[in-house]
Amino acid sequence: MAMTLRDMDAVRPVNREAVDRHKARMRDEVRAFRLRELRAAQSLTQVQVAALAHIRQSRVSSIENGDIGSAQVNTLRKYVSALGGELDITVRLGDETFTLA
């Protein structure tokens, strides 16, 4: 007889921390993919973006491969500026939202 989802959960409960880590990793990958798309739309290579942003090509690669969370704000600002955009930082606290930078 086939197991139901409820049966499977009873045998092997969901590890909420692992699920949350996976969600965060997937969110970073989606953001990185979008940045790669934006760069490609500008017909720029990673080397060109690095030169325009005055950062290493390896850092551009790292950002575009999902390592956005550990990037410094100034590095992200340079990267986005090299693509012709502006980086905004938004703060959300409860019902209040404002742009920090």
Swiss-Prot record:
Alphabetically list the UniProt keywords: DNA-binding, Toxin-antitoxin system
Query: Does this entry carry the keyword Translocase?
Result: no
Q: Name one GO molecular function term.
A: DNA binding
Q: Which residue numbers delimit the DNA-binding region?
A: 46-65
Looking at the UniProt entry, the stretches that span the membrane are none
Residue stretches making up the HTH cro/C1-type domain: 35-90
Q: Does the keyword DNA-binding apply?
A: yes
Entry coiled-coil feature ranges: none
Source species, domain of life? Bacteria
- Induction of expression: Induced in persister cells in response to D-cycloserine.
InterPro entries listed in its UniProt record? Cro/C1-type_HTH (IPR001387), Lambda_DNA-bd_dom_sf (IPR010982)
Function (record text): Putative antitoxin component of a type II toxin-antitoxin (TA) system. Its cognate toxin would be HigB2.
Name assigned to this protein? Putative antitoxin HigA2
What is the source species? Mycobacterium tuberculosis (strain ATCC 25618 / H37Rv)
User: What would be the name of the gene that encodes this protein?
Assistant: higA2
